[in-house]
Amino acid sequence: MLNEPLQPQVAATSVILGLGKTGLSSARFLASRGFSIAVMDSRKSPPGLAALQEQNPDAVLRLGGFDAALIAEAEQLVVSPGVALSEPAILAARARGIPVVGDIELFASYVKAPVIGITGSNGKSTVTSLLEAMARQAGRQVLAGGNLGTPALELLEKPVPDLYILELSSFQLETTYTLDAVAACVLNISPDHMDRYPDLDAYCQAKARIYRGTGTMVINADDFRVASLVQPHRPCLRFTLGMPAVDEYGLQERAGETWLVRGHERLLSARRLPLAGRHNLANALAALALGEAVGLPRAAMLSALQAFSGLPHRCEWLAEVNGVRWYNDSKGTNVGATVAAIEGIPCQGKLILIAGGVGKGADFSPLSKPLIQRARAVVLMGQDASRLEAVLASGPPLYRVNSMDEAVVKANVLAQSGDCVLLSPACASFDMYADFEARGQAFRQAVREILSC
C-alpha cells in the first residue's frame, strides 16, 4: 500500500490541470509539502479560483487554456477528473515522459492506513456511505470520501483513521497506478460517459484499475463484465441477487419473503431495510462483502443496514398525496441507473417517468422494455429530449416540457391513485442545472408547490 512519495525538486513544478474541488485539493496538498505548483484551467473563471488565490497566492496560474511550454517543464502533471486524458497537452506531456497522475495516485503515495476502494456505474455513493456507517457501528475510526464528499487528499490532513473508504470514478482511476486497496469492488458496469470513452470496453478497463492491488476482490456475479475481471489466486468474495454459493452473498426467497443470505445462512429480511428497490439489495450485499473483507463484525453491519435510509437524490421518497407517491432519483444520470430505478421502485399502479438532460452519448434503448412494462407515461425535458423521444416512440405516451415546473405539473395531471412519479433522468444535468443536486432540489420544490395547491 505504501509507495515512495515524489520529493520536491529545485526549480521544478507540479502542474495541476483543472481547478474544481479536486484540483484545489491537489494544489493545497502539494503546496503544503513544499512543491512549487502551477494551476491551469481551460475556463477563464473556474470555481476554485478565489480559494486558490487566497490559499496559494504564489501559485502560477494560467486560465482559458493550457500552457504547453510550462507543462513541458513540469516534474509531474496532476490531472483533475474533469479533464480528458486525450487533451493534446496531456498527450504531449506523456510523450516527453512526464508522469501524469491524479489525486488518488498522490493519495496512494502518502496513505498510512488500509483503503477500501469502491467504483461502478451506479451505487458507488450509497455503498460508500453504507459501509462507512457499518464501520462506525463497529467502533472503527473511519474516513470516507474521494469522488463523494471530501476529496481524498483532504482526508490525509486529518488524524490517521483505522480505515479509509474511497468512492472512485473511472476518471480518477485512469490516473491511478499504485493504489493497493485492502478490498475493492466494481459494483456494476453499464454505459456511461460515452462522450469520454471510445467504447464500453475502454470504460470497463478504466473501472477495472481498482483491482490492480493485492487485496480482496468483491465481485458482482450477476454482471458478466465485472465477473470477467476476477484474477486467479486473488482473494475474492462474490454477491448475487440470486441464490448464492456457500461462500457468497445473495438472496433467498422463503415463504414469500426475501432474505439477505451468506450461502444458506439467512442474515436479514429485506423488509427490514429502509432502502427501496432491488438494486439497493445489491448495494447492501456488496457492502456486507466489503465489510467482511476488512473484518467488520456481522452484527454491527446488520444493525447499520437496518438504520441506513439512503442518500438524497437516490430513489428518495418525497411524498404521497391522493395515493400518488413521488420519488427523487436525480442521481440517475445514466441509463443503467434509470433502468434500476424503474424496475426497483415499489409501485402498486404505473410509473410516470420524468427524464432528459445531457445524454453523454448514451444508447437510450435499454429504457424501452421496462417503460413498456411499468410506465403510464414519460415526461421529457432537456437537451436530449428529442433523442429520447425517438428511441421511446413505440412505448407509453410521451410528453415534452421546457422546465421542471412544467414536468411536475404534467406528471401530476397524468398520475392516478396507486401510481408513482419518478424523476430519474438517465442524463446529466448540466444543460439546465449546476449539478444533479440542484436538479433534485428543483424537483423537490416543484413537488412541494404542486402539492400545496
Curated annotation (Swiss-Prot):
Please give the family membership noted in the entry: Belongs to the MurCDEF family.
User: Gene3D superfamilies recorded for this chain?
Assistant: Mur ligase, C-terminal domain, Mur-like, catalytic domain, NAD(P)-binding Rossmann-like Domain
Subcellular compartments: Cytoplasm
Name-wise, this protein is: UDP-N-acetylmuramoylalanine--D-glutamate ligase
Query: What GO molecular function annotation could you give as one example from this UniProt entry?
Result: ATP binding
* Biological role stated in the UniProt entry: Cell wall formation. Catalyzes the addition of glutamate to the nucleotide precursor UDP-N-acetylmuramoyl-L-alanine (UMA).
Q: Which Pfam families match?
A: Mur_ligase_C (PF02875), Mur_ligase_M (PF08245), MurD-like_N (PF21799)
Which InterPro entries does this chain map to? Mur-like_cat_sf, Mur_ligase_C, Mur_ligase_C_dom_sf, Mur_ligase_cen, MurD
